[in-house]
Amino acid sequence: MSLRNERLNQILTEARPKIARHWSLYDGGFGHGGTAAAVAGVDELLVGYFGKLKDMPDGTPATTILHEIEMLLRGLAEVNASCGGAYLETDERDLLVPIIIEAATVAGLDANEFKDADPTLQFRAKLLIL
């Protein structure tokens, strides 16, 4: 396994318990009116995102990595909509966005090329999520 993929595995392995702890702070462990399906959906989307990044060869164009960020955020927007639009908010942004950016950076994206070093911002604004 490449060092890049080892690092991606490490990021996800460290993030998942933090995310689970976050959900446990809210009603029934689901938070903001979420459901078990919503919690599982967020986890599934993150695992899929990391899998896509790990499958990319070294030197993958930034546009390809950005596409995966956009697809992840679209999926998160769908999960959020399924919970009345109030499931993924500021606290969740503060939790999830750094993980998304760190993984994209490990995959080869230069986050410093984006406003506030946040390549997710353009998609989050468009999708009105996080």
Segments (PLM) and residue ranges:
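Charged, amphipathic alpha-helical oligomerization/scaffolding segments
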Residues: 41-48, 68-71, 75-78, 95, ...
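Short terminal alpha-helical segments
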Residues: 1-55, 127-128
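Short secondary-structure junctions and interdomain/linker hinges
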Residues: 26, 56, 60, 79, ...
